[in-house]
Amino acid sequence: MSIFIGGAWPYANGSLHLGHIASLLPGDILARYYRAKGENVLYVSGSDCNGTPIAIRAKQEGVTAKEIANKYHEEFQRCFRDLGFTYDCYTRTDSEHHHETVQKVFLRLLEEGYIYKKTVEQAYCETCTQFLPDRYVEGICPYCHEAARGDQCDACSAILDPLDLLEKKCKLCGSTPSVEETEHFYFALHTFQEQIKKVVEIVKEKGTWRDNAIQLTERYVKEGLQDRAVSRDLPIGVSIPVKGYEDKKIYVWIEAVAGYYSASKHWAEETGKDDQEFWNSDAQTYYVHGKDNIPFHSVIWPAVLLGIGEEAIPRHIVSNEYLTVEKRKLSTSKNWAVWVPDILERYDPDSIRYFLTVNAPENRDTDFSWREFIYSHNSELLGAYGNFVNRTLKFIEKYYGGIVPKGSIEVELKDKVEGLYKHVGEAIEQTKFKVALETIFDAVRFANKYFDEKQPWKQREDDPVSCEETIYNCVYLIANFANLLEPFLPFSSERVRSTLSIIKRNWEPQNTLPSRIDSVQPLFERIDVKQIEHEVGKLYGAVK
């Protein structure tokens, strides 16, 4: 089976925060799981280096857009690597390859008659002497009356045009823009109305899109899909490949989602492999992003794929809700965020991955609290999982000289482990990652109870053979926990496998156990709860 996984492309205009990771982490869990199953996986993403936010940030700082993009693209790569993300291709939208691929997509849509020219009115800033596309205009959403950008309202998810906004202001200078006529290319989105409607009916029946994606897309379809501009007067981006229009750029909403396609083609060129299997109707496709990106993946990208004759429309949309921080809405402008480069300096990446999975905003907004983060690490990772692994392996080291005693796997435990692979796998495939991880940790707590009830410290004196059986079965559980937890907690899983000299990562019960263990080290360290006050103080600016 061919599995294509696309992670949303973060704007390279500032550091990643935990809100980004909360929405993107499911992609890596899926990729690791399907690879362990032996499936053919292509997992791609990249940095959005062409968007308006980069141009605005560059102008504000008095540097080039390229300098801003380079800085954050490199930082993103480090953060994703340090968090254990296993992209097969992580690229950038200002690469020559991406530009060429997107231009081919544009020309194909033009040739098929899905793109046409139209004279329209557009916001124009007299002070900056330039047209103001999408995010260059800010104001009030006409639907919910919350603050919004010219491309979309985060509060109600409405897709907007800058002229839709009330109380419009130029993002660069704050002046009120005028309205001027200009010519742009438009995508005939309305022609895909019935096809998109059919797609939504199918995924709703199968339950393969998150509810928020289904509900929002149903709303768009009910209102009637509207044609959208595919060109903008932007300083950076992919140039329109039509003579006389080279100064205009392909609008980011079509250019960015086409990044999945360009990354796939780039991977194929780099590896010498064929990527077409990921774009046919048999491919299982997963698109992983936050709810603010739903319309781009549930309406626009399927329409583009249909327009260029590709069959692999989004089978699964994994669109998480928002993550708040200490009960407040995350705000990068107010520095109310937990920044990824910062948290990685002091905390285990598996602790971050664990918390953002068991507290994932899968169906509703959830909160990141430093108190809950640190207590979950100490009680679950250290107190439950780490404790079971450490007490078992230290017992072997102390009483058996590092030699794993011989024994046979208890039928009850074997059945339990086989059931875990089945149920956890099903939950992952259904994008219920929280359920999957909680199911494993229920088994971890069962394992600790098993150890306590068997009392190997007493068995060693009273019944040495039973003690060996107990420890052998505990090693069996540990080996399989490492396998089962690998998609979620790859770093600690690798440490366990190294200690047990286990190489295989297949998604199936690990029945062959090692004869000895090497260098037992604590799987996790306790975090001092005094850190809670320190971290919250930093967030409020009281601590530097």
Swiss-Prot record:
Short sequence motif 'KMSKS' region: positions: 329-333
Molecular function GO labels: ATP binding; metal ion binding; methionine-tRNA ligase activity
GO cellular component, as recorded: cytosol
Catalytic reaction equation(s): tRNA(Met) + L-methionine + ATP = L-methionyl-tRNA(Met) + AMP + diphosphate
The protein's Enzyme Commission number: 6.1.1.10
Superkingdom field: Bacteria
Entry annotated with the keyword Metal-binding: yes
UniProt remark on cofactor binding: Binds 1 zinc ion per subunit.
Cofactor(s) demanded: Zn(2+)
Record carries keyword Cytoplasm: yes
Keywords: Aminoacyl-tRNA synthetase, ATP-binding, Cytoplasm, Ligase, Metal-binding, Nucleotide-binding, Protein biosynthesis, Zinc
InterPro entries found in the cross-reference section: aa-tRNA-synth_I_CS, Anticodon_Met, Met-tRNA_ligase_1, Met-tRNA_synth, Methionyl/Leucyl_tRNA_Synth, MetRS_core, MetRS_Zn, Rossmann-like_a/b/a_fold
Binding-site list for ATP: 332
Pfam assignment, any one: Anticodon_3
TM spans (from-to): none
Family, as annotated: Belongs to the class-I aminoacyl-tRNA synthetase family. MetG type 1 subfamily.
Job of this protein: Is required not only for elongation of protein synthesis but also for the initiation of all mRNA translation through initiator tRNA(fMet) aminoacylation.
Protein known as: Methionine--tRNA ligase
